[in-house]
């Protein structure tokens, strides 16, 4: 998944500063917080299928479900996810001011910049290709690798740099066929689904390998050519599937428990939203033997 790669500090001083950045917000919660007047969500304003200023993303829809359950209106604090998102949203606080938002609706399990809830879905990277272009027999990643060598050698495979997809191409000797896309693009007008909606649909690339929710959503939006989504199994050296959860500030245990209660009580509604957006869901058994 493209946004779960995080770097650690390289020196003792930097490490101490980063730890302080994590611990200070938690310490600030020692006193009882004021009663909530809204469900305040931290979001990327242009990150479909997850979130947008129009409120038509997966996470927007789930936030509305939560707001209704809590009897609170939903408000959003928007900031591009690629630009120090947590520091500038969930953990952003000026002296004398309140935090601008209280929850991040989608973070990978293990993400250490927030206190992570229990997971609410697991998805995997997926391969997307147009029907009728000589790949219709491909139903799995293994099928793709078994295509005629001449066919494989002709394909332009779009992948985001530093993603599991680029690692997979390298492992299977297909680096030369890769068309790299930048994960960290500073242009806020660009969005992850462009690789499918603009380039794959227009024939600029022949295949795209992207995070499953992106694959499923944008493949459904394209009517011509018809696109096929093939979930990929993790294998030794390449982890494709990840559990997704929500994130709150460290130290806010009561709020975290309340969010986890909503995840449990609204499980059916969340599942329906994920299905509507075409998210490929997998469980822990969906992997190649000995993948780790």
Name each model-derived stretch:
Residues 44-47, 122-126, 134, 220-263, ...:
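Periplasmic-binding protein-like
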Residues 32-107, 111-112, 186-190, 276-277:
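Extracytoplasmic small-molecule ligand-binding "clamshell" domains
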Residues 75-151, 231-239:
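Acidic, polar ligand-binding/catalytic clefts
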């Amino acid at each position: 998944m493209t946004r779960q790669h995080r770097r650690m500090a390289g020196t003792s001083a930097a490490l101490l500063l980063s730890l302080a950045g994590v611990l200070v917000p938690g310490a600030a919660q020692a006193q009882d917080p004021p009663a909530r007047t809204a469900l305040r969500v931290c979001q990327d304003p242009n990150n479909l299928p997850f979130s947008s200023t129009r409120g038509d993303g997966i996470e927007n829809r789930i936030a509305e479900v939560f707001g209704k359950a809590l009897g609170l209106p939903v408000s959003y604090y928007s900031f591009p996810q690629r630009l120090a998102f947590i520091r500038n949203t969930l953990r952003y606080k000026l002296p004398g001011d309140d935090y601008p938002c209280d929850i991040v609706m989608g973070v990978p399990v293990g993400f250490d910049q927030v206190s992570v809830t229990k997971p609410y879905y697991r998805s995997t990277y997926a391969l997307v290709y147009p029907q009728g272009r000589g790949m219709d027999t491909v139903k799995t990643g293994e099928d793709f690798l078994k295509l005629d060598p001449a066919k494989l050698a002709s394909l332009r495979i779009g992948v985001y740099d530093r993603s599991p997809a680029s690692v997979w191409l390298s492992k299977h000797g297909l680096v030369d066929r890769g068309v790299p896309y930048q994960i960290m693009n500073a242009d806020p007008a660009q969005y992850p689904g462009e690789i499918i909606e603009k380039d794959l649909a227009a024939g600029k690339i022949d295949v795209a390998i992207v995070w499953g929710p992106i694959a499923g959503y944008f493949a459904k939006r394209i009517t011509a050519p018809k696109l096929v989504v093939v979930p990929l199994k993790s294998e030794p050296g390449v982890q494709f599937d990840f559990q997704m959860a929500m994130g709150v500030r460290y130290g806010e245990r009561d709020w975290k428990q309340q969010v986890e209660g909503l995840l449990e009580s609204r499980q059916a509604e969340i599942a329906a939203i994920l299905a509507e957006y075409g998210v490929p869901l997998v469980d822990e058994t969906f992997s190649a033997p000995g993948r780790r």
